[in-house]
Amino acid sequence: MSKNLSNLEYHADERLGRSTAWKLVTTCPAIVRHEMLNPRPSDSLALIMGSCTHAATLEPDLLDKEFAIKPEEIDGKSSRTNHYKEVFESMQSRNPNIQWLNRSDYRTCVDMAESAREHPLLKTYLSDQETMIEQTGFFECKGVACKVRPDLYNPGAGVVIDIKTTQDASEQGFRKSIRRFGYAFQASYYLNALRILGLKPKQFVFLCVEKTPPYLTAAYEISTAEVERELIRVHDACDTYKKCMDTGIWPGYGDDIKTLTLGNYATNGLLSISQTAEHFNVSRTWVYRMIKTHKIPTLARGKRKMLDMTDFKNAMRWDAEGGKNGKTT
């Protein structure tokens, strides 16, 4: 693992990273190839604020070397004037490694970071000199040159921590983020990478901080079974990437006509109590008990209660594992 690579340099490196690997298994190679040849700008406000929050959380002493507050006025001139634009462009050219934020956005990043740093888990490992912060590792998986850059890794405890800024850090809210952004895949990718690099990670923790005051935090881990299951898709991504690189062929969705079965998606993934009982071959009473025990959210559709099939499947697994309220024991 190396500390000699900046965040911008890491993202510019052409080795296969987690984000590209995730896109290979959730979109198609043609889209991945297009994005490789036409990279998205790295100066979007969301990306800059995310990077600023990470820097302020993990390495606040280095924050001023990478981020600065954009002046509201220059020589009494507003940002709409030519004088302001000329002087600010000169400031940017003299400081090519600095990313600029307005005062309000910069303050938000710092406030989120301060909240995250107060979480007992992060506070413990940030005070440990053994902890590795944003170090880069290069490795090979399935014959593919890959890269990894965990936010924080403590080799003594074997703990990996990834900082996530989110609109909703509640259990239900973060479950949705896990599905939408492939966080189980990310955990599997990182743990696999660190093991290939000769390290011994034991636990992958997501430390979430909300983007709005009071910037609440929460820490989550995904069940070991789900993370291990995602390793199949990590390997699939590497195999697909290698095949595309070797052949120069980056296929799209295919030209064949495909037959789609809507199934549960016809009701947007929702089932009534009776449908849930029938689908899972259980009693209605047992369904109600699971809803109450695991706090499964329901939605009223007329006189019927509807619930998400994925939420119920997760609850069944937690129940079988002896867990409760979305946490395994």
Feature roles, as predicted:
Residues 310-329:
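A short, Lys/Arg-enriched interface patch at domain edges and termini
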Residues 281-306:
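Major-groove DNA-recognition helix of helix-turn-helix-type DNA-binding domains
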Residues 181, 189-267:
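Metal-dependent nuclease catalytic regions and adjoining charged, substrate-binding loops involved
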Residues 167-181, 223-224, 295:
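Short helix/strand-bridging catalytic loops that position acidic/His residues to coordinate divalent metals
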Residues 1-148, 259:
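Metal-dependent nuclease catalytic cores that hydrolyze phosphodiester bonds in DNA/RNA
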Residues 239, 243, 292-293, 303, ...:
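Residue-level detection of the helix-turn-helix DNA-binding "recognition helix"
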Residues 266-286:
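Polyanion-binding surface elements
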Residues 150-176, 190:
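Conserved catalytic cores of phosphodiester-cleaving nucleases, focusing on short active-site segments
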